Amino acid sequence: MAKPTTIKIRLNSTAGTGYFYVTKKNARTMTEKLVLKKYDPVARKHVDFKEAKIK
């Protein structure tokens, strides 16, 4: 069986609230760290979420 190309990643809020999203990305085509602007319900606004490894 072939090795999967998608890996699970954790998107941590930059607002410091501790809120995170879990998503997946193709590690072969997207080699740089992912930064997305998403909604943080704890801060109640849209903030940047940066990629981190799932522990």
From Swiss-Prot:
It comes from the Bacteria. One of its GO terms (cellular component) is cytosolic large ribosomal subunit. InterPro entries: Ribosomal_bL33, Ribosomal_bL33_CS, Ribosomal_bL33_sf, Ribosomal_zn-bd. The keyword Isomerase does not apply. Signal peptide: none annotated. Keywords: Ribonucleoprotein, Ribosomal protein. SUPFAM superfamilies: Zn-binding ribosomal proteins (SSF57829). GO terms for molecular function: structural constituent of ribosome. GO terms for biological process: translation. Belongs to the bacterial ribosomal protein bL33 family. This is Large ribosomal subunit protein bL33. It comes from Maricaulis maris (strain MCS10). The gene is rpmG.
